[in-house]
Amino acid sequence: MPNETNCTLDFEQSVQLFKEYNLFITAFLLFLTIILQYGYATRTKVIYTLKMIVLWCFWPLNIAVGVISCTYPPNTGGLVVAIILTVFACLSFVGYWIQSIRLFKRCRSWWSFNPESNAVGSILLTNGQQCNFAIESVPMVLSPIIKNGVLYCEGQWLAKCEPDHLPKDIFVCTPDRRNIYRMVQKYTGDQSGNKKRFATFVYAKQSVDTGELESVATGGSSLYT
């Protein structure tokens, strides 16, 4: 009869294991803390990209752990709970991809796969350049600014442009809607009277439809040309 080996760690073994790997655990937890706390699109793009990768990895990791829990359940009750949690994780992960793909089809921006938000802002400059940015929700007003020849919106660096490059309408897309914002006010110039150095634009929400950005044309050309 083969010998059965108990792979369960006792308290002393767990303490010893923690002592051996405590430096690695500390460094790993500090890394996650920095990534999750300071990873914003308005700050460091590198840290924000790492944060997105970490968030993308969480769902597959949860599903993998759930499958292991279903394979090696502690008891019948644990098996039922593991199945429920694993199914929930799978449905949530599939739902994320469905919504992201729908949003990508509407605005053609890789920001669609941002796990932090379900909306993407888009500004088509009159020089033909398209600027997309992450946005957490659909606001009533958007206020892009130009500072020293650089366009910002929602605190994010978008492109180098002049005040005359801003269009009459800008958009915020969600998986099922396209929100259209119309320019209602424009302020140009700083204290020195330099109109190219600083400008503020106010866009108010005008209408909502189910169109895609590629249906918008400026000067007879498609948004993607």
From Swiss-Prot:
<dbReference type="GO" id="GO:0039660">
    <property type="term" value="F:structural constituent of virion"/>
</dbReference>
<dbReference type="GO" id="GO:0019031">
    <property type="term" value="C:viral envelope"/>
</dbReference>
<keyword id="KW-0472">Membrane</keyword>
<comment type="function">
    <text>Component of the viral envelope that plays a central role in virus morphogenesis and assembly via its interactions with other viral proteins.</text>
</comment>
<feature type="transmembrane region" description="Helical">
    <location>
        <begin position="52"/>
        <end position="72"/>
    </location>
</feature>
<dbReference type="GO" id="GO:0016020">
    <property type="term" value="C:membrane"/>
</dbReference>
<keyword id="KW-1043">Host membrane</keyword>
<dbReference type="Pfam" id="PF01635">
    <property type="entry name" value="CoV_M"/>
</dbReference>
<dbReference type="InterPro" id="IPR042550">
    <property type="entry name" value="GAMMA_CORONA_M"/>
</dbReference>
<keyword id="KW-1133">Transmembrane helix</keyword>
<feature type="transmembrane region" description="Helical">
    <location>
        <begin position="21"/>
        <end position="41"/>
    </location>
</feature>
<feature type="transmembrane region" description="Helical">
    <location>
        <begin position="78"/>
        <end position="98"/>
    </location>
</feature>
<dbReference type="GO" id="GO:0044178">
    <property type="term" value="C:host cell Golgi membrane"/>
</dbReference>
<feature type="topological domain" description="Virion surface">
    <location>
        <begin position="73"/>
        <end position="77"/>
    </location>
</feature>
<keyword id="KW-0468">Viral matrix protein</keyword>
<protein>
    <recommendedName>
        <fullName>Membrane protein</fullName>
    </recommendedName>
</protein>
<comment type="similarity">
    <text>Belongs to the gammacoronaviruses M protein family.</text>
</comment>
<dbReference type="GO" id="GO:0055036">
    <property type="term" value="C:virion membrane"/>
</dbReference>
<keyword id="KW-0325">Glycoprotein</keyword>
<feature type="topological domain" description="Virion surface">
    <location>
        <begin position="1"/>
        <end position="20"/>
    </location>
</feature>
<feature type="topological domain" description="Intravirion">
    <location>
        <begin position="99"/>
        <end position="225"/>
    </location>
</feature>
<keyword id="KW-0261">Viral envelope protein</keyword>
<feature type="topological domain" description="Intravirion">
    <location>
        <begin position="42"/>
        <end position="51"/>
    </location>
</feature>
<comment type="subunit">
    <text>Homomultimer. Interacts with envelope E protein in the budding compartment of the host cell, which is located between endoplasmic reticulum and the Golgi complex. Forms a complex with HE and S proteins. Interacts with nucleocapsid N protein. This interaction probably participates in RNA packaging into the virus.</text>
</comment>
<keyword id="KW-0812">Transmembrane</keyword>
<dbReference type="InterPro" id="IPR002574">
    <property type="entry name" value="M_CoV"/>
</dbReference>
<keyword id="KW-0946">Virion</keyword>
<keyword id="KW-1040">Host Golgi apparatus</keyword>
